[in-house]
Amino acid sequence: MSGHSKWSTIKRKKGTLDAKRNKIFTKLIREISIAARMGGGDIDSNPRLRLAVNKARVANMPKDNIEKAIKKGIGDNMGSEYFKLTYEAYALYGVALIIKCLTDNKNRTASEVRSVLSKSGGSLGAPGSVSYMFHKKGLISYNLDKYHEDEIIELALEAGAEDIYSEGSQVEVITSADNFESVSSILRTKFEEDIAEVALVPESKVALDKEQMDKVLAIIEKLEDCDDVQEVYHNLEIVDDIC
């Protein structure tokens, strides 16, 4: 078991959730509804829906909102057809970005993403130009205020986890993308996770000084503010106390 989590800075800290709550909720509702429409409204038998609902719970979305989003999806009242898009790009200083989008208008989304990048000094890359720098991993996180660390570790290893990281009041179980569902299902029989998702993890990270890091984080924030952007993965080394 490793002592320090390599996951703690994979995705940029979003700051105060309240400031962006409406935008975040809108994106999550869309994701939940589409997952329900594609795979049904049963969370236990629809992995994509389960992941979407878990994200909503982490964001403190009210249960009523989640249920309405599921009903909207299975009722097929969504209107427009939605598409999943992935853009590979570069921010400043060679930082690689993978931008995951969910949209009902491909041209609008492409224009918005391209505009943010060009105005900020970044650029879109060709397919494959960035994706080779990342690999998929499963992340399942637990709060140690609720459970005993040794019990989580024991069951996680028995279930086939690749690694386990302990930091502060959190234990993070790492799995392969293929084993994520089976490991998380086994752990769920005894523990309720705080986070459960499949994410893109960089093979290595780019270290910058504070001024450079802040510029890159500003680009990521602008991309995340786009209505159609669901996730922005990057290989920036984020250091909170950098001088």
UniProtKB/Swiss-Prot annotation:
Q: Which GO terms describe its cellular component?
A: cytosol
Mind telling me which SUPFAM superfamilies this protein's record contains? YebC-like
- Keyword flag Zinc: no
Q: Does the keyword Phosphoprotein apply?
A: no
- What is an example of a GO molecular function annotated in this UniProt entry? DNA binding
Gene3D superfamilies listed in its UniProt record: 1.10.10.200, 3.30.70.980
| Keywords from the named record | Cytoplasm, DNA-binding, Transcription, Transcription regulation
InterPro entries recorded? Integrase-like_N (IPR017856), TACO1_YebC-like_2nd/3rd_dom (IPR048300), TACO1_YebC_N (IPR049083), Transcrip_reg_TACO1-like (IPR002876), Transcrip_reg_TACO1-like_dom3 (IPR026564), YebC-like (IPR029072)
Q: Which domain of life is it from?
A: Bacteria
GO biological process, alphabetically ordered: regulation of DNA-templated transcription
Q: In which compartments does the protein localize? A: Cytoplasm
One matching Pfam family is Transcrip_reg
Q: What is its main location?
A: cytoplasm
**Cited NCBIfam families:** PRK00110.1 (NF001030), PRK12378.1 (NF009044), YebC/PmpR family DNA-binding transcriptional regulator (TIGR01033)
What family, per the record? Belongs to the TACO1 family.
- The name under which this protein is listed is Probable transcriptional regulatory protein BRE_29
Q: Write down the species.
A: Borrelia recurrentis (strain A1)
